[in-house]
Amino acid sequence: MEKILAINAGSSTLKWQLFEMPSETVIAKGMIDRLGLSDSVFTAKYGDNQKFKEVQDVTTHEMAATLLLTRLKELGIVSHLDEITGVGHRVVGGGEAFSDSMVINPVALDEINRLAEYAPLHNPTQAYYIKIFTALLPGVPQVAVFDTSFYSTLAPENYLYSIPQEYYQTFGARKYGAHGTSHRYVAHRAAEILGTPLESQKMITLHLGSGASITAVQDGHAVDTSMGFTPLAGITMGTRSGDIDVSLVAFLAKKLEITMPEMIDILNHKSGLLGISELSPDMRDLEETAATRPQSALALSIFVNRVVKYVGSYVALMNGIDTLVFTAGSGENGSELRADICKQLACFGVKLDEEKNNVRSQERIISADDSKVKVLIVPTNEELMIARDVMRLK
């Protein structure tokens, strides 16, 4: 048995899980929230439903990593740090340089830092944590698991933009996608639940959280995905606009007398469900107010509309669909949302079982027995996918 630590780091959070492998048992999990502030919060769940929480100053990433390893020992989760035999790190941007997860060496770490211009909010922090854990756990393999590597199988027809090709060749201007680790996990897990090889299925996975994306999977590989050069592209999201005419972006920047970075910030943080509803980016708030606020109802309708359009285009791309999978916050918990989406996909043979669909975040098949398309809820587990890759590669 081996203990593998999975790290999912953001600029102000550090999510972690410790697995016993290969049994895939969760030994402990938790997070450090509000990093960089005076009231950072460390939480852990471990053992027989034991919970631990503390508030203290965690002002640097070094402090966060050190605190995590210290608490693992002090709480008795591990007796010695050398019990940890591998660490896996989520890395958002792998560009074209990384078509698979890999054990990190200095050259690879430099490349991850170089790719920061493609994922400026994530790569620098995630690369830094790799460096920190390498120092704190000397000799322990550090494995980077890239969000983008699942999309290395996309054909040029699906990843290239219709712009002068010198921009792709010189600057790497192309679709990279995101949420790849989540889509990869739920696709494989759905195939396991159905008892059918993934390679024999035409599957569409819907990662519907505050950030949302859709991926088409055929012959066991991703063939297209809704997010693009950045996670701003694709369907309407919590605060992101999704697809938009770029001329409108320039037009609005001029009218508002703001810079292009300021305009992009609006599209990333003030648009989507929040922008349309003028209330909230949270699907639950919109569902609660839809009956009395037309803008809330409109935001929900637009979201469903965009999802259905992408699913329809992917069905055409793959010349059919066998399986539809819902995951992430709204996808796992939103029974009404799932019903609204599937109702508009009835033309493809999608039919829900109303009773089976009335669940929250529970792994199950929710399609009717006579549905031509299998519909499932599969709660995502990026950390487990990371741990599996560590075991495969270290």
Curated annotation (Swiss-Prot):
The record lists Mg(2+) as bound by 8, 382
Give the record's pathway: Metabolic intermediate biosynthesis; acetyl-CoA biosynthesis; acetyl-CoA from acetate: step 1/2
Describe its partners and assembly state: Homodimer.
Question: Cofactor note, please?
Answer: Mg(2+). Can also accept Mn(2+).
Name of the protein in question = Acetate kinase 1
Which domain of life, per UniProt? Bacteria
**Active-site residues (renumbered):** 147
- What EC number(s) has UniProt assigned to this enzyme? 2.7.2.1
Coiled coil stretches, renumbered: none
Which species is this record about?
A: Latilactobacillus sakei subsp. sakei (strain 23K)
What the protein does comes down to:
Catalyzes the formation of acetyl phosphate from acetate and ATP. Can also catalyze the reverse reaction.
Which PROSITE patterns does its entry note? Answer: ACETATE_KINASE_1, ACETATE_KINASE_2
The similarity annotation says:
Belongs to the acetokinase family.
Catalytic activity as recorded in UniProt: acetate + ATP = acetyl phosphate + ADP
